[in-house]
Amino acid sequence: MNEDNGSRFHPSIESLMKFGLALEKVWPYNEDVYSQKPSPEAYEDAATRKLVKELNVRLSSDAIKSALADGYPVAGSFVLYPSFDDSGGYIPMPTAEEMEESKDPEKQHRHGHHAMTIVGFSDQMKMFLVRNSWGVDWGDKGYCYVPYEYIDNPNLF
């Protein structure tokens, strides 16, 4: 394997149920070792945090806010565009140009689909708080803010 092409959602959920989730301080994000198995310590730590069950949540801001209010984080697959790279943690709606270019195989957007976990929301800001897997040096200490509008667009989430 020479490059990281991301992962598929359902095998990731199955892995969280089987192995669990290691804390970042035990197995930090490092893009140079994506193809290596985690350390035995990471497996041991992860075993204390296994996903117990998965629930399907309707793809709408209101349904996701309800799940969050009930104490459930929501994992989702986001369609990302080049503006994601320069967002500084505030994910903008893609421009019309970005969405049009994404249809051209020669100009495919860099990230494609990317799994992240929605962990909070602010009705005042009309944004979700989302945890990425790229470590604390990315975005706002590993988090980003995604507008409700992004989530409610079936072409983006």
What are these regions (language model features)?
Residues M1-R131, V136-F157:
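Predominantly the structural core of cysteine protease catalytic domains
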